[in-house]
C-alpha cells in the first residue's frame, strides 16, 4: 500500500505537484543509489507482471473463469503498451523508495536526479517509435510523425493529456476514498456503489427508449471511443498484495482499489464485500517534471484514424493483414463464413474467454485492431462491417489500378476508411450529440494547425462515457422484413458479452445489423440513467458468475485517474459553479436529483465528473448537457484541427476525391457489406420499417474513379 510521507520538514521543502526541472538539484541520491534502487524494483515489478500473465492464462484455461478474469482479458496490457506501463510502475516504485531512503540521510533537501532515474528505468523523453518520413502520404500505425514539430504528439502509448491538474488524495497517486478518514474539500467521498444505487439505478424499463435515435447511434459512439482511447489496467507491483487478496478478500493495497458494497446492498449476499477493481496503467513522468502526479496511458492513437481496425502497434497491424495476397487485404476468418461474406479472424492464441460462454459451441474471440472487439456482439458486428469495407475498397482499387502492389492498396484503402469514420462522426453523429452547441464548439474547418494539441484528454475518457446511458436492456435480431428473427429474437444485453458464438453459429451479423437500424437507443433520463443489465450484470454472460456495476466502475475510475470535481470542470468551461443545494437545483432543473447528490457528496465541488456531467439536462436537439457538450466539443475540435492527415486538409485527398467521399453514408456501407437490401437514409435517426427505409439501389455509391492513377 502507498504510504504518504508525513515529515513536515519534507512537505515544507518540496511539494508533490512540483519538482524543480534541474537535472541535478541535489546529490541526495547518487547514480549508484538510483541504479541499485531501480534494479531491485525491476525484479519485483517484472515478477508481478509475469505472475499476472501466467495467472490469467491458467485461470482462463479453466472451465469457470470469474467476471474479473473475463474483464481482465480485454483490459490486459499487451506489447509496447505493457512495456510502457511496466516502466511507469518501476519509475513510481523507485521514486517512492529513493524518496524514503534519501530523506533519512538528508531531510532538508530530498530532491532526486529525476533525469537519471528516468534514464535508469528506461523511460526517456517521448520520441517517435518509428522513423518519420515527412513525404509519406500515409499515417504511421502508431500515430507518430503526424505533427512535424512534435512527432510523438498524439501517438499511442503516451500519457493522456491533462486539461486541469490531477487531484489525488496525497497529491501524487492515491485516489480520493483510499484513506477512510481523509476528506475532500472537508467531506468524505461516498462509496461509488452507493452513488450508483441511489442515483443511477432504476427498475422499470418502460418508456426508456429514445424516440429519435437508432440503436446504431449508441453503437457508433462506442466505435469512436474505441478508436480514440484505451487505458488498460496495470499490475500489482508488490509481493504483499496479490490479485487473490484483492478479488477474494477485498484487501486494498498497491494498485488494488476495491469497490466496497454499502450496507443493505443486495450484492452482499452473493458477491461478498466488494467488486474487485484494479487501477489503470500509467506512464513515466516526462521532463521538465513539473508534476509527478500519476498520468494514465492511452494505448491507442489519439487520432480518428480507424486504429480500431488496423491496430496501433506495427506488430499487431502486420498480424491483421493478409500478407500472402497482393491485394492489400486484411486477414479474414478461414474457419467460418457469413453466407459467403467474411468474418473477423479468430484470435487463436489460447486461452479464449469467449469459448467458455458456450462450452458446446466453443467459438473463440475475434482478432481486430482493438482487443475489445468481442466485448459485446453489436461491437463485433460493427468491427466486421469495417473489416469487410476495407477489403471491398482494396479490391475495387485494384480493378482501377492493376499495377498497384499490395502495400499501396492497403494504405489507400486504410486512408479511405479512416476518412469514412471521420465524415460519419462529424457530419452525422456529433451534430445530434451536441445539438445546438455544435457550432459553438466545432466551427467550420479552417485547415490543419500544428499548434493544436490533438491528444485525448483524461477527462474526455469520462465525458464520452455518456454513451453508457444510451444502452438498452435488450438487443433484437430481425429478419429481411424487419420482423423478429428466430425463436430468440430478443436477447438480454448481459447474455451478449463475449458471445461470439451467437454470430458464428446463430445467424451471422445481418439480423443484428437490422436491429441496429430499426431498434432504438435508450434515452438518457435523470430518473433512469443506466440499465440494470450494465449496473448489476456487466460481464455476466452466464448465470454461473456474478456481474459487475459499470456505473460504480466509472465513478471509481474517476478517482483512480485523479479527476477534478464537477465544479472545477464547470469553471473550466465557463459555466456557473453551484455551491449550494439551491444552486445545484437550478443547474440540474431537478430538485430531487440535486438533493440526492448533495446528500451523498455534501458539496457540488466533490461530485464525480461522470455522474455530474450526465446529470445535467440535455441541450436542445442534443443528447448531452452543457458541460459534456463543452468537453466533447473541445476534444473533437482538437482531434480535427490538430490532425495533419484530416480528410479535409488540402493535399490529403484531391478535390475530386473529397467530393466523392462526401457522398458516403453508413447505409451504403451496410448495403455493400451485408445481404441487407433495405436501409434507412439516416442511419442514426430512429427509423420505422418500411416507412423510413429505401432500397439499396437508391443509396449513393462511392465513386472511386478519382483514385484511378494516371499511370494506367
UniProtKB/Swiss-Prot annotation:
Glycan attachment residues as annotated in the record: 106, 212, 322, 358, 449
Cofactor(s) recorded in Swiss-Prot or TrEMBL: Ca(2+); heme b
Pfam families linked to this entry: An_peroxidase
Site residues, Transition state stabilizer: 372
Known catalytic reactions: 2 a phenolic donor + H2O2 = 2 a phenolic radical donor + 2 H2O; iodide + H2O2 = hypoiodite + H2O
Entry keyword annotation includes Calcium: yes
UniProt xrefs under CDD domains: myeloperoxidase_like (cd09824)
Cofactor info, note text: Binds 1 Ca(2+) ion per heterodimer.
Signal peptide: 1-22
BP terms from Gene Ontology: antibacterial humoral response; hydrogen peroxide catabolic process; response to oxidative stress
GO terms for MF: calcium ion binding; heme binding; lactoperoxidase activity; peroxidase activity; thiocyanate peroxidase activity
Positions bearing Phosphoserine: 315
Cysteine disulfide links: 123-284, 132-145, 246-256, 250-274, 354-365, 573-630, 671-696
Annotated active site: 226 (proton acceptor)
Tissue specificity note: Mammary gland; milk.
Cellular component annotations (GO), alphabetically ordered: cytoplasm; extracellular space
Binding locations of heme b: 225, 375, 468
Thermal dependence summary for this entry: Optimum temperature is 60 degrees Celsius.
Family statement drawn from the similarity comment of this UniProt entry: Belongs to the peroxidase family. XPO subfamily.
Function: Heme-containing oxidoreductase which catalyzes the conversion of thiocyanate (SCN(-)) into antimicrobial agent hypothiocyanous acid (OSCN(-)) in the presence of hydrogen peroxide (H2O2). Also involved in the conversion of iodide (I(-)) into hypoiodite (IO(-)) in the presence of H2O2. Responsible for the inactivation of a wide range of micro-organisms and hence, important component of defense mechanism. Shows antibacterial properties against E.coli, K.pneumoniae, P.aeruginosa, S.sonnei, S.saphrophyticus, S.epidermidis and S.dysenteriae.
Additional free-text comment from the UniProt record: Thiocyanate (SCN(-)) and hypothiocyanite (OSCN(-)) are bound in the distal heme cavity. The iodide ion (I(-)) occupies a position which is stabilized by the interactions with heme moiety, His-226, Arg-372 and Glu-375. Hydrogen peroxide is held between the heme iron and His-226.
Name of protein: Lactoperoxidase
Origin species: Bubalus bubalis (Domestic water buffalo)
Amino acid at each position: 500500500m502507498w504510504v504518504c510521507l508525513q515529515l513536515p520538514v519534507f512537505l515544507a521543502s518540496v511539494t508533490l505537484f512540483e519538482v524543480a526541472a534541474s537535472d541535478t538539484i541535489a546529490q541526495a541520491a547518487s547514480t549508484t543509489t538510483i541504479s541499485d534502487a531501480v534494479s531491485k524494483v525491476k525484479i519485483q515489478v517484472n515478477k508481478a507482471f509475469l505472475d499476472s500473465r501466467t495467472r490469467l492464462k491458467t485461470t482462463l484455461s479453466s472451465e469457470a473463469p470469474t467476471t474479473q478474469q473475463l474483464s481482465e482479458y480485454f483490459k490486459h496490457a499487451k506489447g509496447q503498451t505493457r512495456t510502457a506501463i511496466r516502466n511507469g510502475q518501476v519509475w513510481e516504485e523507485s521514486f517512492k523508495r529513493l524518496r524514503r531512503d534519501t530523506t533519512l540521510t538528508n531531510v532538508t533537501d530530498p530532491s532526486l536526479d529525476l533525469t537519471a532515474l528516468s534514464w535508469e528505468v528506461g523511460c526517456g523523453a517521448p520520441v517517435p517509435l518509428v522513423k518519420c518520413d515527412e513525404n509519406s502520404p500515409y499515417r504511421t500505425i502508431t500515430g507518430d510523425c503526424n505533427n512535424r514539430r512534435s512527432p510523438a504528439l498524439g501517438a499511442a502509448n503516451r500519457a493522456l493529456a491533462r486539461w486541469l491538474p490531477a487531484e489525488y488524495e496525497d497529491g501524487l497517486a492515491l485516489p480520493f476514498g483510499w484513506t477512510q478518514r481523509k476528506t475532500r474539500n472537508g467531506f468524505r467521498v461516498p462509496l461509488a456503489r452507493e452513488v450508483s444505487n441511489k442515483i443511477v439505478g432504476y427498475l422499470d424499463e418502460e418508456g426508456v427508449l429514445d424516440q429519435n435515435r437508432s440503436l446504431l447511434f449508441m453503437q457508433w459512439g462506442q466505435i469512436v471511443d474505441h478508436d480514440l482511447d484505451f487505458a488498460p489496467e496495470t499490475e500489482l507491483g508488490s509481493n504483499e498484495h496479490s490479485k487473490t487478496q484483492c478479488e477474494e478478500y477485498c484487501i486494498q493495497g498497491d494498485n488494488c482499489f476495491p469497490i466496497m458494497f454499502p450496507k443493505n446492498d443486495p450484492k452482499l449476499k452473493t458477491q461478498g464485500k466488494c467488486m474487485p477493481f484494479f487501477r489503470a496503467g500509467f506512464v513515466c513522468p516526462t521532463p521538465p517534471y513539473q508534476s509527478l502526479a500519476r498520468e494514465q496511458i492511452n494505448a491507442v492513437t489519439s487520432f480518428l484514424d480507424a486504429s480500431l481496425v488496423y491496430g496501433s502497434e506495427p506488430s499487431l497491424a502486420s498480424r491483421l493483414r493478409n500478407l500472402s495476397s497482393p491485394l492489400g487485404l486484411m486477414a479474414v476468418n478461414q474457419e467460418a463464413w457469413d453466407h459467403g461474406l467474411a468474418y473477423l479472424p479468430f484470435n487463436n492464441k489460447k486461452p479464449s474467454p469467449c469459448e467458455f460462454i458456450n462450452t458446446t459451441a466453443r467459438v473463440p474471440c475475434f482478432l481486430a485492431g482493438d482487443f475489445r472487439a468481442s466485448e459485446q456482439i453489436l461491437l463485433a458486428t460493427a468491427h466486421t462491417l469495417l473489416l469487410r469495407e476495407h477489403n471491398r475498397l482494396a479490391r475495387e482499387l485494384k480493378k482501377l489500378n492493376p499495377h498497384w502492389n499490395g502495400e499501396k492498396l492497403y494504405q489507400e484503402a486504410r486512408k479511405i476508411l479512416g476518412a469514412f469514420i471521420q465524415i460519419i462522426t462529424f457530419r452525422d453523429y456529433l451534430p445530434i450529440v451536441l445539438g445546438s452547441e455544435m457550432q459553438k464548439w466545432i466551427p467550420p474547418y479552417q485547415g490543419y494547425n500544428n499548434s493544436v494539441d490533438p491528444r485525448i484528454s483524461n477527462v474526455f475518457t469520462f465525458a464520452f462515457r455518456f454513451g453508457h446511458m444510451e444502452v438498452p436492456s435488450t438487443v433484437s435480431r430481425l429478419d429481411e422484413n424487419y420482423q423478429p428473427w428466430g425463436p430468440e429474437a430478443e436477447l438480454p444485453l448481459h447474455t451478449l458479452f463475449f458471445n461470439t458464438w451467437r454470430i458464428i453459429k446463430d445467424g451471422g451479423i445481418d439480423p443484428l445489423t437490422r436491429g441496429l437500424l430499426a431498434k432504438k437507443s435508450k434515452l438518457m433520463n435523470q430518473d433512469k440513467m443506466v440499465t440494470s443489465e450494465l449496473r448489476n450484470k456487466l460481464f455476466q454472460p452466464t448465470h454461473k458468475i456474478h456481474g459487475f456495476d459499470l456505473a460504480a466502475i466509472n465513478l471509481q475510475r474517476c478517482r483512480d485517474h485523479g479527476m477534478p470535481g464537477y465544479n472545477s470542470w464547470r469553471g473550466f468551461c465557463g459555466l456557473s459553479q453551484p455551491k449550494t443545494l439551491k444552486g445545484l437545483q437550478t443547474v440540474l432543473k431537478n430538485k430531487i436529483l440535486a438533493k440526492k447528490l448533495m446528500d451523498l457528496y455534501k458539496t457540488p465541488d466533490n461530485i464525480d465528473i461522470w455522474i455530474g456531467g450526465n446529470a445535467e439536462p440535455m441541450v436542445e436537439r442534443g443528447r448531452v448537457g452543457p458541460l459534456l457538450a463543452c468537453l466533447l466539443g473541445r476534444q473533437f475540435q482538437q482531434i480535427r484541427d490538430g490532425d495533419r492527415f484530416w480528410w479535409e486538409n488540402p493535399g490529403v485527398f484531391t478535390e475530386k476525391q473529397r467530393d466523392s467521399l462526401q457522398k458516403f453514408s453508413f447505409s451504403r456501407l451496410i448495403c455493400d457489406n451485408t445481404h441487407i437490401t433495405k436501409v434507412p437514409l439516416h442511419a442514426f435517426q430512429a427509423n420505422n420499417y418500411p416507412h423510413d427505409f429505401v432500397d439499396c439501389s437508391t443509396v449513393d455509391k462511392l465513386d472511386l474513379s478519382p483514385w484511378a492513377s494516371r499511370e494506367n
